[in-house]
Amino acid sequence: MSVQGIDGVLQQMQVKALQASDTPIARPSVEPGFASELKAAIDKISDTQQVARTQAEKFTLGVPGVALNDVMVDLQKSSISMQMGIQVRNKLVSAYQEVMNMSV
């Protein structure tokens, strides 16, 4: 292979490297991780509470099609999800305190 052939290949490689560096890297909009999962769980608890509040309000106003048993089930779901969220928070705080008390 001649020197001119190698120079041509080298030039092509440099052009490709420049093109690659100009191309933005596509990153996922939501990076999977603990923080995003925790936020999703908290949002779900909030949504459950909002649905229960809305159902209770509709029942109180006498909107047709809203039964008392549906309202009670939604309120219980909301209560249980909130209790679970509190327990998870307590475990997280406990784990954080345990890690902070470790000697290095």
From Swiss-Prot:
Its main location: other. The keyword Cell division does not apply. Pfam families: FliE (PF02049). The keyword Ribosomal protein does not apply. Coiled coil: none annotated. InterPro entries: FliE. One of its GO terms (molecular function) is cytoskeletal motor activity. GO terms for cellular component: bacterial-type flagellum basal body. GO terms for biological process: bacterial-type flagellum-dependent cell motility. Keywords: Bacterial flagellum. It is found in: Bacterial flagellum basal body. Belongs to the FliE family. This is Flagellar hook-basal body complex protein FliE. The lineage of its organism: Bacteria, Pseudomonadati, Pseudomonadota, Gammaproteobacteria, Enterobacterales. The gene is fliE.
